[in-house]
């Protein structure tokens, strides 16, 4: 494959103040710091919604919550709107999602050529570490 790679890391409940590349001297984030040193960092980034599913749907589609209709975590994104992932995939780029997105279903066209789900989602709840918290 030729061309540039794009890596988007989306983290719930994560503040830039918890990263070494933004000046935190206690929290050690060497891999993210290295990526930030070679890539792009934002000094003013805001979430379109305090609800994780709504924010992910807005990030995926470039639309506001009132446009994508994902008002809460009980109304998951199901790929009904155009997304940057779908556009890249449809132009022969591999688009891979790793982790939980809480989209409605893996059967929906979410725009990813591959989705790697956490064990507790991929195995109908088997493997979820219930006793650890």
Predicted features and spans:
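Formylglycine-dependent sulfatase
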Residues: 1-133
């Amino acid at each position: 494959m030729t061309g540039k790679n794009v890596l988007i890391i989306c983290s719930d409940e994560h503040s830039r103040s918890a990263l070494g590349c933004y000046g935190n001297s206690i929290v050690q984030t060497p891999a993210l710091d290295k990526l930030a040193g070679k890539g792009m960092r934002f000094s003013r980034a805001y979430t379109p919604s305090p609800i994780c599913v709504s924010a992910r749907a807005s990030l995926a589609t470039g639309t506001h919550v009132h446009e994508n209709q994902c008002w809460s975590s009980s109304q998951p994104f199901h790929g009904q709107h155009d997304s940057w992932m779908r556009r890249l995939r449809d132009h022969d780029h591999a688009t891979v999602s790793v982790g939980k997105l809480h989209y409605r279903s893996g059967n929906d066209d979410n725009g990813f050529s591959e989705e790697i789900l956490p064990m507790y989602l991929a195995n109908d709840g088997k493997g979820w570490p219930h006793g650890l918290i």
